[in-house]
């Protein structure tokens, strides 16, 4: 049986945690930052976790993670 391919875009966006979850970065923090409030940018800074609703999609994209 052939190996399952990893979705490379997902591999660059998500990192597996010790408890089986996945870390992710928040969106909206790349460009056009001058019109966004400092508070909004500060809250987007820390890493988040993938929600349980989306976990199945991420696991399917990363079969060897």
Swiss-Prot record:
PROSITE patterns: RIBOSOMAL_L35 (PS00936). The keyword Cytoplasm does not apply. One of its GO terms (biological process) is translation. GO terms for molecular function: structural constituent of ribosome. The keyword Metal-binding does not apply. It holds the Pfam family Ribosomal_L35p. GO terms for cellular component: cytosolic large ribosomal subunit. Keywords: Ribonucleoprotein, Ribosomal protein. It comes from the Bacteria. Belongs to the bacterial ribosomal protein bL35 family. NCBIfam families: rpmI_bact. This is Large ribosomal subunit protein bL35. It comes from Yersinia pestis. The gene is rpmI.
